[in-house]
Swiss-Prot record:
Region ranges (Disordered): 1-43, 178-254, 274-338, 366-405, 438-457, 469-501, 530-558, 587-611, 631-678
UniProt organism field: Rhizobium rhizogenes
Composition skew (Polar residues), residue ranges: 204-220, 274-286, 537-550
Ranges of Basic and acidic residues composition bias in the record: 230-242, 378-388, 649-661, 668-678
Alphabetic keyword roster: Crown gall tumor, Plasmid
Name of the protein this chain belongs to: Protein VirD3
Source superkingdom: Bacteria
Bias-annotated ranges (Gly residues): 306-315
Length: 678
């Protein structure tokens, strides 16, 4: 042991532990070390076995696929030998013929020895060229320096597999750990191998280089949350499972273009600017990767083709801060319509200008009617004051002389030049028609009694529309008071005269006056017999309800100057019948029928029906007004009424039993009635 030398195959005592106890086992392991850092610490240790590389697969490296590639730890106890290699080998070293725990312990002890003796790495590295002299095939190794804290060596071993070894003593970059954690893989650990079939990596190996470009800002199209992109390791690894990592040094140009297309045109496409920073040596800091430039060109070209309108102007663009620029609509130019002549274009422009002016004129001339005016809620004059000269009755503004008003021209947007094809005679005829139509509509509207205005005037008072009919005279079609004096409002709102209706004859005027007189008389009679004021009275659980009563008053005497036709008396009789039909007159019935009705109402919980006489002599049953109660008060009233009726019936029964009166004989037959009271 003391005379051992560092050769291509050297033996190092390694204390191992097994079931039999502690002992020392010699293992033959070829090794080499990478260049040391400036502070003297080693950055990586590449490990291979002493057996030929094509003879088998080391322990702890399971089979993986291209789609489900993952990082696995090189623990021999968790792996099984591939098919065809499970038979017993006699040429294996002694450490490989032992159990898996001995091999793991020996490897750990060997790494500790290398860490304690950094001065021997040069001697170990110098022994590497002797491998070719001894006839041993050296594994194909490609160094991929990562950041300042780690270095990765890719080695090709037997059966078409590659091993990416991370140094045991190297510090893992925090960004790389975050990126692996976001993918659910966990951070890279010491002694962890990334194994994938070399056939799947053949295309990527031809594209990759031994170094990465200088730290630069790469504009990459990426679909997904930004947290999955920031801190992702883009040095040499590509996660094919998720498809989210875009590594420019490894992926081909065709794959980059396809990725840019699929990610830009998707619904989740986002244009992000990710700063992909990689650490390289000072000698390679000045070099710039052409893949980065091509990636930027492809991204900008794809986004530019889809973000342009018909005229070549950009429609939508995204900056690196994810804030969209304002959208600019395309503008039409004369070049877009080569079939149109200059005259046609000028005509189109003139039409567009006229339409624009008309729309602006309508907006400026429209009256503001939606503004709330608290003081004019019941005033009809307030609307005309706010309508900019527009009359309150909605008449079109027409000049007295028959000409057009300037305000009407402004409100409609029409001018005389717009109707150059109309002659003076046609314009005069139009003015005459407008004037006659306005006069006719105003005459008909003013001739009718303004009952709607009466309702507005008395909206907050006690008088009703019926009482307002006092202002309408009998012998005049215009509203007036009973004494013949016209009210100011009636004079203002009604200005009809015989001259307004030249087509009506005297007979038609007389018929209209008689009809109006009949209507007013019926209204007055109904007002005398029907009171609008509510009277209250108490009953069995009944609340205050309006009662119907007669109000004394002298009937209105018709005008004696006008003859009263015979059909007027018929109409008066019909009106009196309708008014009298509203009064309920209880009928006089026997005590037996009244008791039966009360008992039925008590039994079924319904109000007791009352009897009344119709004006034609028929006796009908009707429900009194006092018993029509709604809601909870009705139920309480019925309950109280039933309790009172039960108490009254019990009192009557006791009185009849004591006095032995006649009502008890009703339920007895003739035989029992003979001996009753003896």
């Amino acid at each position: 042991m003391a005379n051992e030398e560092f050769t291509g195959h050297f033996a190092r005592p390694a204390p191992v532990a097994n079931d039999e106890g502690r002992r020392t086992t010699s293992t033959s392991i070829p090794a080499h070390a990478m260049a040391a850092r400036e502070d003297g610490r080693d950055t990586s240790v590449a490990v291979t076995l002493s057996r030929p590389p094509n003879s088998g697969i080391p322990h702890g490296i399971p089979e993986t696929s291209a789609s489900g590639r993952r990082l696995v730890a090189a623990h021999p106890q968790d792996a099984a030998m591939p098919l065809g290699l499970s038979e017993t080998r006699t040429d294996l070293p002694a450490i490989l013929r032992k159990n898996n725990g001995d091999f793991r312990t020996a490897m750990q002890h060997w790494r500790e020895l290398l860490h304690e003796n950094p001065d021997k790495r040069d001697r170990e590295a110098s022994a590497l060229p002797d491998l070719g002299a001894r006839g041993i095939k050296r594994p194909r190794e490609i160094e991929h320096p990562g950041d300042a804290n780690r270095s990765v060596t890719r080695r090709e071993i037997g059966l078409g597999r590659e091993i990416d070894t991370v140094a045991a003593s190297s510090l893992v970059n925090r960004d790389t750990w975050v990126a692996h954690s976001s993918n659910g893989q966990g951070g890279p650990q010491a002694g962890v191998y990334n194994v994938q079939p070399s056939a799947d990596r053949a295309q990527e190996t031809s594209q990759e280089s031994s170094t990465l470009p200088d730290p630069t800002s790469v504009s990459a199209l990426y679909s997904g949350p930004p947290s999955e992109w920031v801190g992702r390791d883009t040095g040499y690894e590509t996660d094919r499972n998720s498809g989210d990592t875009i590594s420019a040094p490894i992926r081909g140009l065709e794959e980059l273009e396809d990725s840019a297309d699929s990610r830009y045109f998707g619904h989740e496409a986002q244009s992000l600017s990710a700063n992909v920073t990689t650490s390289i040596s000072n000698a390679e800091a000045s070099s710039h990767s052409e893949h980065t430039e091509i990636l930027d060109d492809v991204s900008s070209a794809r986004s530019g083709e889809q973000g342009r309108g018909g005229d070549g102007g950009a429609i939508l663009g995204f900056s690196h801060d994810l804030s969209p620029h304002p959208q600019r609509l395309p503008q039409t130019t004369p070049d877009d319509f080569p079939e149109l002549t200059n005259a046609a274009m000028a005509e189109i422009d003139a039409i567009f200008e006229s339409l624009s002016q008309k729309s602006l004129a309508r907006e400026s001339a429209a009256p503001v009617l939606h503004e709330p005016v608290s003081g004019d809620a019941f005033q009809k004059e307030g609307t005309s004051d706010r309508a900019d000269g527009m009359p309150s009755n909605g008449e079109p503004p027409v000049e007295q002389a028959g000409g057009h008003l300037p305000q009407a021209l402004r409100s409609s947007g029409a001018e005389l030049d717009d109707f150059s094809w109309l002659t003076d005679a046609a314009l005069a005829e139009i003015d005459a028609l407008i004037k006659s139509h306005s006069n006719r509509s105003s005459s008909v509207r003013n001739a009718a009694p303004d009952l709607r205005g009466a309702g507005l005037d008395n909206a907050v008072g006690k008088d009703s529309v019926i009482e307002h009919a006092e202002k309408i005279s009998i012998d005049s079609p215009r509203p007036a008071r009973l004494n013949g004096e016209r009210s100011p409002k009636a004079q203002k709102s009604s200005q009809a005269s015989l001259a307004d209706f030249p087509d009506l004859t005297d007979a038609e005027w007389a018929h209209i006056e008689e009809t109006e007189r009949i209507a007013i008389t019926a209204i007055e009679k109904g007002k005398q017999k029907i009171s609008t004021k509510a009277d209250t009275r108490s009953g069995f659980g009944n609340s205050s309800v309006p009662q119907v009563g007669n109000r004394s008053g002298a009937p209105m005497v018709p005008n004696t100057n006008q003859p009263i036709p015979s059909w007027y008396h018929k109409a008066e009789n019909i009106s009196n019948g309708l008014v009298e039909d509203t009064h309920i007159t209880p009928a006089v019935v026997s005590s037996r029928r009244r008791n039966d009705a009360e008992n039925a109402s008590t039994r079924f919980g319904d109000p007791a029906p009352a009897l009344r006489h119709y004006n034609l002599g028929r006796t009908l049953e009707a429900t009194p007004v006092r018993d029509v109660i709604s809601g909870t008060s009705r139920d309480r009233g019925l309950t109280a009424h039933a309790a009172d009726q039960l108490a009254i019936d019990d009192s009557r029964k006791r009185t009849d039993r004591d006095r032995k009166t006649q009502p008890y004989i009703r339920g007895l037959d003739s035989r029992s009635r003979e001996g009753y009271g003896r």
